[in-house]
Amino acid sequence: MRRAKQLAADSCTRGVFVAATDTGVGKTLVASALVKCLTQRGIDVGVMKPIETGVSRSRKAQSDGVRLQNAAGHCDSMAEVCPYVFRLPVAPLSAARAEGKTIQMATIMRAFNHLHQKHAYMIAEGAGGVFTPINQSLDVLDLINQMKLQALVVGESGLGGINHALLTLDALRRRKIPIVALVLNQCRPAHTKTARLQEQSTVSLLRRLAGIPVVGPLPYNPNMKKNWNESVVRFAKTAPIKKLARLVLASGQGRFSQPG
């Protein structure tokens, strides 16, 4: 715990928001592995998934919020870790409307601020891409701004990944949100020569064009869902995640820095 106190006192960096170029590109994997890596370094990490959709009663134990909390290894209230949970697997605005609810930024920020005060470092995970609407007037970009966190962008390493990544980075920059890194994830196996060529092209061009560190690509793991916790532990020990941990801890000196 001594190291956690040093982080809060000596560094302006207090957290990162794991955003994505799209849904299903590996946000929860990257966030969970990063949480595990930081906690293994003795850093007290708080986690949050402000909004999660597609959580049926039978799937609660496998929800993103629970997986993040398991990676952190603490017992914060799930009502704070994930203030809004909806059944339908659709955008937050639609999922909330289907249940006759409205997502309130104030509710999310109360939970975030409480967790932020308890922990030396916060990792929050978004829902979908950065323009995903969370209510009638706000989107995920507004959420990142409210939390005053740096962004960590997760994207796909295959075909189409270049456009999605550059659009996302541009959107964040237009809102003056600091970006730590772009993490590329192999969402599908690259079995064919063409698929491997496409991935190599995507990664190479993004390293040239992104203007920020590009980490990965993280390899495709077909057994991830069956052995989630074990996979996260393994990923946390890999060179890309260790590099990511160094990047997030070394950054954060911009306008979103918060006192310890």
Give short role names for the model-derived ranges.
Residues 2, 170-260:
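C-terminal lobe/tail of nucleotide-utilizing enzymes
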Residues 15, 29-102, 106, 113-114:
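N-terminal phosphate/diphosphate-binding loop that engages ATP/GTP or pyrophosphate donors
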Residues 18-19:
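Hydrophobic anchor at the beta1->P-loop junction of P-loop NTPases
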Residues 49, 152-155, 180-186:
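Short internal beta-strands
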Residues 91-134, 141:
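Phosphate-binding/switch loop-helix module in NTP-utilizing enzymes
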